[in-house]
């Protein structure tokens, strides 16, 4: 609570396996360097490395109020685990080269995070009174439930990227937009199901495929 947390040479948060972090009215900054061993670069990661030093289970990140500053890479990355991410009224500063808001996929990490083609993520993401920008990337070996509540907004696209999904699977991306929440579609999007009581808007003719 009311913490100042700054990582000058790494991601801001790394949660592995059955562990959790809850922040209230805190300021979080990450500055991870690009690394050829990784498939991508991130600010917050929820994952399972299979090194044996962390019990397998649901990883949880919850943040209520405060700020996140991302100085390099995408924002949230989850792979080879089950996880819960909940954001409420967090002020987010993105870097100019941010590749995603959330990536929920398998991986081909050179450190060996699970079996390639079977190491996706099962992610429950909830935005509460939360403004968000950037793409949400998912694949067919992952399960993503993405909830927008209480006036949350997203400016971005839902992108199905099978680069790290091997032969694929039966995964999904379910999107729920509650009343007073808004998704502004900035790129052609693919999702599995949509429940919309809010608003979906697009000024550039982008498509949403379900």
Predicted stretch roles:
Residues 1, 5, 207-210:
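Short, intrinsically disordered, charge-balanced linker/junction segments flanking boundaries
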Residues 2-9, 24-43, 59-72, 88-102, ...:
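Beta-strand-rich solenoid/repeat architectures in extracellular/passenger domains
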Residues 5-17, 30-33, 70-77, 81, ...:
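Glycine-centered low-complexity coil/loop motifs and glycine-rich tracts
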Residues 9-12, 44-53, 72-75, 111-113, ...:
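Short, recurring structural edge motifs at helix starts
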Residues 17-18, 23, 56-58, 63, ...:
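Parallel beta-helix/beta-solenoid
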Residues 30-55, 95-116, 159-168:
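Acidic/polar low-complexity surface segments
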Residues 50, 54-55, 80-81, 198:
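Long, ordered, amphipathic alpha-helical scaffolds
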Residues 116-119, 123, 129-210:
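Extracellular beta-solenoid/beta-roll
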